[in-house]
Amino acid sequence: VYRNFLEMQNLNDLHYKKLKEMNFTDDYIKENQFKSIENNKNKKKEICMKLQEQGLKLDGIPGFFQDTDFKWTYKSHKGIFIPVTLNNKIQGLRILLDNEYRLDTENIWFSSNNEYNGTKASNWPMILKDNTVNWIDMYNSDNSTSIIIATEMILAHKLFNNTNKTVIGIPNNIDKDLILSIVQRMNASEVFLYADKYTILHTSTLMYENTVKSLERQNIKVEFRVALNENDIGSELKENEKNIKIA
């Protein structure tokens, strides 16, 4: 549903310029389906109707809901859709907002749980990897590796774009269990944990400490880094690449 839905969205000049300022190439933008959100009321319903004509069901899909006329539509936001991909499937859509939301966050889920027949989004992780890396091999490797985790999807894309290393993106509320699950599944011995501005300002210090301590109890080294100059983020990993094996 999401893949076809994104094909019906466009990318406006303002958002294109914003993405280019983040050092994303045209090919990267197209390949990852970064799109502006269509907010015209009639066009939204036309898009939903086209999806249904393709045989796709919208009930149970986060972000979609039925309007007062019982026609399907979706939640309106001003921003850019960031697809959250896991195992070759778009599990959900994260939104990079034009204007900051509550508590100064620029990132929210495409969700419709408070609407009629709407659905709440789950806290999905995202894995960005080179096309030559096989999903099964990545999860079942016996070799111990270092992995990169970023506490927001757009930050994960910046890291992947700058390093071409496997990057795991997670929502910016630092889900300890989610991080532990990913690290164990990928047999990681070292974690480079990058935090965005919102996470630093609004996430409990205790939550950070619990996450780091849980990893260290399993003899996993943690390199905690704050993403200050986000557009150049990850450059230090390139400099140290000879000394560390990053997935």
Predicted regions and their residues:
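TOPRIM fold recognition
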Residues: 91, 103, 144-147, 153-247
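Short, exposed beta-strand "edge-strand" segments with a Pro/Gly-rich flavor and a Y/T-containing core
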Residues: 18-24, 34, 115-137, 227-239
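A generic structural signal for short, non-catalytic loop/turn and secondary-structure boundary residues
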Residues: 24, 29, 75, 142, ...
